[in-house]
């Protein structure tokens, strides 16, 4: 499909720009929530400074591809479940454009959602049952200080953060997607408040070339204090 090829091209440009910026900042751990096909993993593996990757992808087909690609890499730990507020069973809505698969509720009144369904032929064709755990539960015994947390879960970002209340303070950077459309029933203002309450400040925005969303990089101000 031509549209898919076009958006894959734009995505490559977008991911490359984030990777280039990441060369300027210091971190040792990469936490990739919504690993998809490894777009971030493949780039960030080039950073020798990163000691460990924790990667989460609940889509079973995509997870198998990640395992086949990275199973021999000792720097990478792969997890085949979603992250959210707490441990539970969830449904993942599978889109024919796999990067748009989501656990979030849709706003059926959204004009952008209607546009995607018609023009881009982006439809959630099926659902699968998946396991969900919380960030705090999975990573509580891991050393995640000085980490870069990337969250790209198509409208489910707030849920991920709500499950990280105890350990979010250890993340040095958080990269999170901000959709400009109202296709999901969520509010980015709640995400900003949660991050602000945890001493995170915005330092950089990366706009997708089509300008329908941006990735925002937040910095944990605790790391400005000595001996943290």
Predicted regions, residues:
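Phosphate/nucleotide-binding beta-alpha loop and adjacent structural elements of enzyme active sites
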Residues: 1-228
């Amino acid at each position: 499909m031509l549209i898919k090829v076009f958006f894959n091209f734009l995505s490559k440009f977008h991911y490359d720009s984030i990777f280039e910026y990441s060369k300027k900042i210091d971190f040792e751990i990469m936490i990739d929530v919504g690993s998809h096909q490894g777009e971030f993993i493949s780039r960030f593996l080039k950073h020798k400074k990163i000691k460990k990757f924790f990667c989460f992808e609940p889509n079973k087909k995509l997870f198998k591809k990640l395992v086949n690609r990275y199973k021999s890499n000792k720097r990478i730990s792969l997890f085949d479940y979603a992250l959210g507020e707490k441990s539970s069973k969830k449904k993942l809505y599978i889109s024919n454009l796999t990067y748009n698969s989501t656990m979030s509720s849709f706003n059926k009144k959204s004009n952008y959602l209607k546009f995607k369904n018609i023009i881009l032929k982006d439809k959630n064709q099926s659902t699968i049952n998946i396991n969900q755990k919380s960030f705090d539960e999975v990573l509580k015994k891991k050393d995640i200080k000085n980490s870069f947390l990337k969250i790209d879960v198509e409208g489910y970002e707030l849920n991920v953060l709500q499950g990280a209340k105890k350990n979010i303070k250890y993340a040095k950077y958080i990269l999170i997607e901000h959709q400009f459309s109202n296709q999901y029933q969520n509010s980015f203002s709640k995400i900003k408040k949660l991050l602000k309450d945890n001493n995170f400040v915005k330092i950089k925005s990366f706009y997708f070339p089509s300008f329908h969303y941006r990735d925002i990089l937040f910095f944990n101000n605790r790391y400005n204090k000595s001996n943290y």
